[in-house]
């Protein structure tokens, strides 16, 4: 049980597969908008993951520690493949606080098909972060509103990086400095330290 926060709590679950500079920019932007931000690594039932949940959670935890903002916390206990379960856990952690569920605009079209989508949208305020190449269309917005949501589009500038692209192209420049040593040490995603 955590004491109710002053103001809303932003909730951001991510595959963090691996965490990118885009994740870093998003988390840094969220702490400028919300008094408390919780993040965790999660398994997305619609994705194949390149590392285990435990490994991805460790990497995300390292990124959160490197950001070092007291408004940002790594809350792995919120993780669930199902958003409704995460929201139930968050409501128990922050009773009485407004919960703001943060997703990228690439997921906006998927939300109406999520398990118990109407209940999810009834328990939180939906905040959508623009992602390059994935505009939030009026059709997406109307589908969300039909389920009772009043989505808010956050004015954050996030670098056009995607974990899947980093995995496919092995581009270390898109990996936050705090995460890169662990990827090299453990040879994650094909990134290995050069032999001595």
Predicted features and spans:
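Nucleotidyltransferase catalytic core that binds NTPs
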Residues: 1-196
